[in-house]
């Protein structure tokens, strides 16, 4: 596991002064790239259909004008180009992708030309799950997904994911434990709480391992 000492310097731009980083990880390259394979397969199948269509269009039996046929095929085969471009994007983004667990929130860092950050406060997390597929299991990694209420226009859930990280079950338990502690502090900030944790005004203390 990574610590503050080897944390990418760019995380300092969004970390609060009183915020501690408890875990930082990076996605496994193979698993990260595999996230783009479904879109790539669809694009290649679409491209294969367009290639077959193009061979018929440009054969001697066809009278289709080139000024119409070429732009049409280029536009129609967009899913193929987008699938390939997405794989290139994932390759370039991987080196700039890191995940962090802090005393206040989850942090996700990525970006190609620039650096993008996304944070998820613990009180917003409604559901979490950890997935370890066959490929991930063979690489000793897994993916943690957190749902914070965001949905698509059709009502599908939008997850924030820690993709292909090492020790996924340990990190999952760590996030769940911190989330329960922080939510309890926010929901019941009063002096009647145990002396070791009188309210959210206190600083979250990392338990000794």
Protein language model features and the residues they cover:
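Short, charged cytosolic
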Residues: 1-25
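Flexible glycine-/small-residue-rich
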Residues: 25-27, 103, 110, 124, ...
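Alpha-helical transmembrane spans
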Residues: 30-96
